[in-house]
Amino acid sequence: MTHSPLAQFDIKKLIDIKMFGFDVSFTNSSIYMLLASILALTYFYLAFYNRKLVPSRLQVSAEIVYNLVADMLNQNIGVKGRKFIPLVFSLFIFILFCNLLGMTPYSFTATSHIIVTFTLAILVFLIVTIVGFVKHGLRFLTLFLPHGTPLWLAPLIIVIELFTYLARPVSLSLRLAANMMAGHVLLKVIAGFTVSLMIYLKFLPIPIMVILIGFEIFVAILQAYIFTILSCMYLNDAINLH
């Protein structure tokens, strides 16, 4: 029987847990998010626990990732953004490892579920809002009224800017979840046809499949980068009011 391409996204309970009337069961999504966190911690521990003047390849790769995030913050926020390196770096690494872990056979892609990506997006949204009010007080509300806006146009602009601001976590989460789900569905569908196509095209479908997998790995890395760079831009709006 041919399985549905969407079956790979099914949430399955591993340990049934009820707490205060809420279902907080440990699922396959939970275990893969936990596994992604453990793999990330292990990777950076092995890369930095014995740092050398002449770095190993593992240390070089870890430093490249760190510098990538540091540059994102520096280019978008400036020196003031350095204090947010732990937050943004953790966000990028968690999403990256969840995305890449989902590329392994018979695994689960936690970031293909909107509840996971929306939680991350809401976290960014709340931090940005709190930082904005803590740093600027009520002046943060001027974010919704660009400087130089005509008075008669102000009510409309405020509504549009407020709606755009509130829509940030929705667009941020949907973009990541939709791209990860679409890519995996495409791979599943094409993989299902590969065996049949090999009867007529011999081994031609195999390199095509390899290319598609390589492209999906690129998308997994790119989506982690896009989520993070947008988070940096939102932080910049809160720190450096325009």
Curated annotation (Swiss-Prot):
HAMAP family in the record: ATP_synth_a_bact
- According to the record, the segments passing through the membrane are 29-49, 84-104, 114-134, 140-160, 181-201, 203-223
**Could you tell me what this protein does?**
Key component of the proton channel; it plays a direct role in the translocation of protons across the membrane.
Tell me what this protein is called: ATP synthase subunit a
Report the Gene3D superfamilies cross-referenced here. ATP synthase, F0 complex, subunit A
Which CDD domains would you find in this protein's record? ATP-synt_Fo_a_6 (cd00310)
A GO CC term assigned to this protein in UniProt: plasma membrane
Q: Which domain of life is it from?
A: Bacteria
Key words, A-Z: ATP synthesis, Cell inner membrane, Cell membrane, CF(0), Hydrogen ion transport, Ion transport, Membrane, Transmembrane, Transmembrane helix, Transport
- Lineage in the entry? Bacteria, Pseudomonadati, Pseudomonadota, Alphaproteobacteria, Rickettsiales
Gene Ontology terms, MF aspect: proton-transporting ATP synthase activity, rotational mechanism
Instruction: Write down the membrane topology.
Output: Multi-pass membrane protein
How it assembles, according to the record, is:
F-type ATPases have 2 components, CF(1) - the catalytic core - and CF(0) - the membrane proton channel. CF(1) has five subunits: alpha(3), beta(3), gamma(1), delta(1), epsilon(1). CF(0) has three main subunits: a(1), b(2) and c(9-12). The alpha and beta chains form an alternating ring which encloses part of the gamma chain. CF(1) is attached to CF(0) by a central stalk formed by the gamma and epsilon chains, while a peripheral stalk is formed by the delta and b chains.
